[in-house]
C-alpha cells in the first residue's frame, strides 16, 4: 500500500479509493444528542470569561495600566505583558504538538480537559490577590502567563471533542454553535462585569457599589470570571463520554514524551509527501490566526494607553466588538458557500491590515471606536472560513487528524503576535508601535495563504 493510501490522502488532497470510508457518527458521535452538543458548547460559553475578562478587556488592562503604572525601569508594562504571553506561547509550542496525540492514545481526553480547565480556573481565582501595587505586577504577570498556557492547552482536547458531538453532515453547524456560544458568553460576562462592578464614577462602582480602592472591584471581577468558567465547564465533563483506547496507531499509543515528537514528525512528512496544499494551509492559517488572537489580546490595552478610552468604557467596546465579530461570522458563512472560504479569508485579512494602518495614523476615542469595530467585523469571518477551508480539505475519516494538526500548528506559533507586539513597543518605546507587530503577523499569514489552492467544494448528498 502506498504512503498516500496509508495516510488517507491522494496527491490532490482527496479521498483514497482503496481505504474504506469511515462513518464518523458510528465511530465517535453515534450517541451524541442535543444535550451533549449543548454541554460541549457551554464550555466555550464559560471559557469566554478567560478570553474576554482576563486576557483582553479587564484584568490585563488593570495589570498594565494600574498595577504596573509605577513600575520602575525603562520597560513599559505592556511590553512585559507581551513577553510573558510570548513565553507562555513558546511553552505551548513545545507541548501542544504531542498533547492531543497523547490524550487520545491514553483515552484521557476528557480527564485532560478537566485538569487543564481546573488549572486555568485556579490561576484566575488567584488573580484576586493581585493588588493595585507595582510589587504585585510580577505575580499578576506570572498568573496571566500560566493561565494563558493552561487555557491554550485545554483547547486541544476540547476541539478534539467536536467529532464526538457531530457528524460530517453537521460538523459545521455544531462548530459554529460553539463559536457563537463563545462570542455571546463573552458578551454576557462583560455586561455583568461592567454594570455590576465597573460602571459609574466615584469610590464605589457598579450596581453593587463595589469599592475601587486597591483594585477591589477588578479583583472581584477576576473571581467572578473564575466561578463563571467553572460553572459552565462542568456539563461537558458529565455529558460527553470518554473515548475508549484506540488501536489505530499502536506506535503513537506506546510512544514516550520524545517518541511522540518522532510520531508527529513521521505524520507530517507523510502529509507533506502526498498533500502539500493541506500543509501550506495549516502553516498559513496558524500564522494569521495568531494575528487574529493578537487583535483581541492587545486591543483593550491600546484603547486605554494610546487612544484615551476610559477604563470603564473598555468593556463597552469589548461587548460591541464581540457582537460585530459574531455577526460578521454569521454573514460570512453565506459568502463562504457561494465564493469559497479562501476569498473570504483573503478579503478579511486585507481589510484588517487596512484598518490597522488607519489606526496607526489616527488618535482619540472616536477614531478607535470607528476603525477598531471595522477591524473586528472581519475577525469572525476569517476564523469561521479557516475552519470551513480545512473541513473541505480533509478526506472522509481523517477529519480528526486534520483538526488535530490545525490545533497543533496554531498553538505552535501562538508566541508570534505577543512577541512581535512586545518587540515593537520596546524598539520604538511607544505602545502604538505594537500595532505594527500584529499587522506583520497578519500580512505574513496572508502572503502564505495566497499560493494555497482553493479546496474543491463538494455538496453532500445528505
Go through each PLM region and give its residues:
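A membrane-interface helix-boundary motif in multi-pass transporters
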Residues: 72-75, 195-227, 423-442
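Structural signature of the two symmetry-related core transmembrane helices
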Residues: 111-126, 343-358
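Multi-pass alpha-helical transporter architecture, strongest
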Residues: 228-239, 436-462
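Intracellular juxtamembrane helix-capping segments at the cytosolic ends
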Residues: 153-166, 381-394
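Helix-to-loop junctions at the C-terminal end of transmembrane segments
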Residues: 94-108, 327-341, 425
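Juxtamembrane intracellular "pre-TM" segments in multi-pass secondary transporters
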Residues: 19-38, 241-283
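Short amphipathic helix-loop junctions that connect adjacent transmembrane helices
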Residues: 54-78, 297-313
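Helix-loop junctions at membrane interfaces in 12-TM secondary transporters
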Residues: 128-142, 360-372
Amino acid at each position: 500500500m502506498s504512503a498516500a493510501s496509508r495516510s488517507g490522502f491522494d496527491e490532490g488532497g482527496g479521498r483514497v479509493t482503496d481505504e474504506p470510508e469511515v462513518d464518523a457518527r458510528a465511530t465517535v458521535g453515534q450517541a451524541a444528542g442535543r444535550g451533549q452538543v449543548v454541554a460541549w458548547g457551554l464550555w466555550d460559553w464559560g471559557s469566554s470569561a478567560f478570553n474576554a475578562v482576563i486576557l483582553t478587556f479587564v484584568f490585563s488592562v488593570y495589570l498594565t495600566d494600574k498595577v504596573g503604572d509605577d513600575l520602575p525601569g525603562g520597560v513599559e508594562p505592556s511590553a512585559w505583558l507581551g513577553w510573558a504571553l510570548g513565553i507562555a506561547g513558546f511553552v505551548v509550542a513545545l507541548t501542544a504538538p504531542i498533547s492531543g496525540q497523547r490524550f487520545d492514545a491514553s483515552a484521557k481526553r476528557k480527564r485532560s480537559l478537566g485538569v487543564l480547565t481546573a488549572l486555568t480556573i485556579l490561576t484566575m481565582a488567584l488573580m484576586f490577590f493581585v493588588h493595585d501595587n507595582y510589587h504585585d505586577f510580577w505575580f499578576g504577570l506570572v498568573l496571566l502567563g500560566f493561565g494563558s498556557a493552561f487555557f491554550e492547552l485545554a483547547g486541544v482536547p476540547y476541539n478534539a471533542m467536536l467529532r464526538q458531538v457531530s457528524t460530517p453532515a453537521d460538523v459545521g453547524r455544531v462548530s459554529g454553535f460553539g463559536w457563537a456560544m463563545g462570542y455571546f458568553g463573552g458578551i454576557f460576562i462583560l455586561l455583568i462585569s461592567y454594570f455590576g462592578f465597573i460602571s459609574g464614577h466615584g469610590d464605589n462602582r457598579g450596581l453593587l457599589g463595589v469599592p475601587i480602592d486597591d483594585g477591589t472591584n477588578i479583583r472581584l471581577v477576576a473571581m467572578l470570571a473564575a466561578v463563571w468558567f467553572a460553572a459552565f465547564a462542568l456539563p461537558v465533563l458529565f455529558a460527553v463520554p470518554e473515548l475508549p483506547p484506540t488501536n489505530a496507531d499502536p506506535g503513537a499509543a506506546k510512544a514516550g514524551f520524545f517518541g511522540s515528537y518522532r510520531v508527529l514528525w513521521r505524520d507530517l512528512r507523510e502529509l507533506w509527501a502526498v498533500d502539500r496544499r493541506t500543509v501550506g494551509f495549516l502553516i498559513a492559517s496558524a500564522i494569521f490566526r495568531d494575528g487574529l488572537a493578537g487583535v483581541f489580546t492587545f486591543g483593550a490595552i491600546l484603547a486605554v494607553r494610546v487612544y484615551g478610552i476610559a477604563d470603564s468604557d473598555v468593556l463597552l467596546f469589548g461587548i460591541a466588538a464581540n457582537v460585530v465579530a459574531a455577526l460578521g461570522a454569521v454573514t460570512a458563512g453565506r459568502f463562504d458557500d457561494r465564493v469559497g472560504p479562501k476569498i473570504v479569508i483573503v478579503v478579511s485579512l486585507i481589510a484588517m491590515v487596512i484598518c490597522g494602518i488607519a489606526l496607526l495614523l489616527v488618535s482619540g476615542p472616536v477614531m478607535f471606536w470607528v476603525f477598531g469595530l471595522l477591524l473586528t467585523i472581519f475577525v469572525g469571518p476569517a476564523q469561521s472560513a479557516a475552519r470551513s477551508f480545512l473541513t473541505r480539505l480533509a478526506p472522509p475519516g481523517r477529519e480528526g487528524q486534520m483538526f488535530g494538526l490545525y490545533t497543533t500548528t496554531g498553538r505552535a506559533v501562538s508566541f508570534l503576535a505577543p512577541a512581535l507586539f512586545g518587540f515593537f513597543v520596546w524598539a520604538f518605546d511607544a505602545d502604538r508601535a505594537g500595532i505594527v507587530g500584529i499587522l506583520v503577523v497578519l500580512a505574513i499569514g496572508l502572503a502564505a495563504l495566497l499560493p494555497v489552492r482553493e479546496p474543491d467544494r463538494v455538496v453532500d448528498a445528505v
